[in-house]
Amino acid sequence: MNSPLVVGFLACFTLIAAIGAQNAFVLRQGIQREHVLPVVALCTVSDIVLIAAGIAGFGALIGAHPRALNVVKFGGAAFLIGYGLLAARRAWRPVALIPSGATPVRLAEVLVTCAAFTFLNPHVYLDTVVLLGALANEHSDQRWLFGLGAVTASAVWFATLGFGAGRLRGLFTNPGSWRILDGLIAVMMVALGISLTVT
């Protein structure tokens, strides 16, 4: 359980599974069975780039300023707990996700929209670059093993979400499904945030 690979997988999975604009878009594409592979690939490759940037950048920062780790660690813990509380609020008041119309959309339009959901969301930089970078660098020489775990979680999540959505078409239009998923996310995020403050 203390393996950087496992910790990286769990940390990334906990963050990435929060239902936001990007995941809702991937889910809709999966439910509609439209351009699923390119969307999953774009999301995964984007995370690989962002995770690597976070690990590389924070490695240099912490090498020059070791005390910065404490600031990032407690800031990250507060962010995780806050995000967990937001997930708990969504679980309290879930909303069904209804697939939109049946008119096919061109691949280029879908990819541009997916890129916008990915890179125009400020949380992607906080989650993927800042927070995962800081968590990875707690493992010093094994930070890239943490990164490998995080990248694996990203690939598993987006592939499962995109390709699994078509099979769960009826389930994810039900608000109760969001309640369960967001409830689990809330528990995992708050637990990870608390663990950061005590390590």
From Swiss-Prot:
Regions that span the bilayer: 6-26, 42-62, 68-88, 144-164, 178-198
Induction note: Positively regulated by LysG in the presence of lysine or histidine.
GO MF terms held by the record: amino acid transmembrane transporter activity
Subcellular location: Cell inner membrane
Coiled coil: none
Entry's Gene Ontology cellular component terms: plasma membrane
GO process terms (BP): amino acid transport
Keyword set, alphabetical order: Amino-acid transport, Cell inner membrane, Cell membrane, Membrane, Transmembrane, Transmembrane helix, Transport
Topology in membrane: Multi-pass membrane protein
Domain of life: Bacteria
Family: Belongs to the LysE/ArgO transporter (TC 2.A.75) family.
Function: Catalyzes the efflux of L-lysine.
Protein name: Lysine exporter LysE
Originating organism: Mycobacterium tuberculosis (strain ATCC 25618 / H37Rv)
